[in-house]
């Protein structure tokens, strides 16, 4: 039987299982989408019971089939999600949706007693995002659902809850508590004092390569504590680039620049410019810039396609014009992004009248996006830093125009494409390598 590490990779849309062999190649994978249900307030949420059953059945089926010997299991999930347990260790809440609206005025006392919204957000590296801050979720349950709160004995972030299903151990990890939770004091690298003031006790985080031995369906298996997916995605490149500082540009709907080498604490200027911090499994801050630029690109691709009557993916077939790139850099015009970037961003159709061709419009759009990306990278780079490489992962690493503009606007660094697939799952697997 082939020895493997099983990874449960939970996204908002797809729930996946991967098996990695001793060379960290994927030898099996499976995925499933789940219908949402309603929480106790009637708001849509993931069906945690169905997800639990699926995970446990997947592991059991692999064991029974006999083709693979599972030596370790680990978990990676999206952030901003908590589960609450009672004294009997039973889950007493649904998996509340982090998109659920909250009135931040209900928490003004927390901010007021801890230096105000700006200072509290800076210190915890957590912009005031409502439900996206799991610390705020805790206070919301405490204030609005006392019947539930009075039963709470333990609070787990999503990855640690999945680990708990197999180990029955209450754990925490640095990547989860460090992901815009408003519970972690990044100045002192410990839990923030407000938790003690509110009589909220959270488990001390452990390092990501620690595991608990558990008997699962009669077999001894090392079970990791799990980790946050964004932090997990940077682990494979950290392993590859030992001794070299780099920034990872994770590109999708959001373009997130992640710098795991920043030593400086988050500033108010950075916070106001869409910067925050994550943490590595070893308790190292990952200063990050998070911008909604992928969405802008997506919206204007549709407008360009309609206006110039071409295929939606025409941009991928454009012949790279270095001369046009340099011409636009010299002109330094702002056409598409003269206003702020909102999450409900809509295209301005009339702008396209300025352009004689699809190519000229698309190049201008990407130039402006790249300028924003470079500003984000510069914001998260320490003054004395020696960043030599920018890795691009996600959809934009196939975009020749995007890569060319980045190279021209940031000539001091080498632009590389991340060839790693399933980065989050691989990162979680690498942490379990000692148990293979």
What is each stretch, according to the model?
Residues 7, 112-126, 139-152, 157, ...:
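Active-site core segments that coordinate phosphate-bearing ligands/cofactors
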Residues 24, 73, 100, 141, ...:
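Residue-level signal for inorganic ion chemistry
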Residues 133-139:
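A charged, well-structured terminal subsegment
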């Amino acid at each position: 039987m082939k020895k493997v590490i099983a990874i449960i990779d939970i996204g908002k849309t797809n729930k996946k299982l991967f098996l990695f062999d001793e060379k960290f190649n994927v030898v099996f994978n499976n995925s499933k989408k789940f219908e949402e249900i309603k929480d106790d307030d009637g708001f849509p949420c993931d069906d945690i019971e169905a997800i639990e059953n699926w995970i446990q059945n997947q592991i059991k089926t692999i064991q029974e089939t006999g083709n693979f010997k599972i030596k370790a299991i680990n978990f990676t999930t999206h952030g901003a999600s908590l589960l609450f347990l009672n004294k009997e260790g039973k889950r007493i809440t649904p998996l509340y949706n982090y998109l659920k609206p909250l009135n931040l005025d209900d928490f003004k006392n927390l901010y007021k007693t801890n230096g105000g919204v700006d200072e509290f957000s800076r210190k915890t590296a957590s912009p005031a995002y409502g439900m996206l801050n799991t610390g705020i979720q805790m206070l919301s349950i405490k204030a609005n659902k006392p019947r539930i709160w009075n039963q709470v004995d333990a609070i787990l972030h999503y990855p640690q809850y999945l680990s708990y299903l197999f180990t029955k151990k209450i754990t925490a990890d640095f990547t989860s508590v460090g992901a815009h939770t408003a519970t972690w004091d990044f100045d002192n690298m410990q839990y923030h004092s407000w938790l003690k003031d509110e009589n909220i006790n959270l488990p001390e985080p452990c390092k990501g390569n620690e595991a608990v031995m558990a008997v699962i369906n009669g077999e001894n298996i090392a079970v990791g504590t799990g980790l946050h997916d964004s932090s997990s995605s940077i682990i494979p490149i950290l392993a590859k680039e030992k001794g070299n500082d780099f920034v990872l540009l994770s590109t999708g709907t959001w373009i997130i620049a992640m710098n795991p080498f920043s030593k400086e604490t988050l500033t108010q200027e950075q916070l106001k410019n869409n910067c925050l911090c994550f943490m590595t499994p070893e308790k190292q801050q990952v200063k990050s810039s998070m911008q909604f630029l992928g969405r802008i690109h997506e919206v204007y691709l549709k407008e360009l396609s309609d206006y110039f009557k071409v295929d939606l993916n025409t941009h991928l077939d454009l012949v790279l014009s270095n001369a046009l790139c340099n011409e636009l850099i010299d002109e330094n015009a702002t056409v598409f992004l003269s206003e702020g970037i909102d999450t409900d961003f809509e295209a301005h159709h009339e702008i396209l009248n300025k352009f004689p061709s699809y190519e000229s419009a698309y190049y201008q759009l990407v130039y402006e996006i790249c300028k924003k990306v470079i500003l984000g990278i510069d914001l998260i780079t320490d003054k004395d830093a020696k960043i030599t490489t920018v890795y691009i992962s996600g959809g934009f690493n196939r975009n020749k125009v995007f890569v060319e503009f980045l190279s021209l606007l940031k000539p001091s660094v080498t632009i590389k494409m991340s060839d790693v697939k399933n980065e989050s799952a691989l990162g979680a697997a690498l942490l379990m390598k000692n148990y293979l």
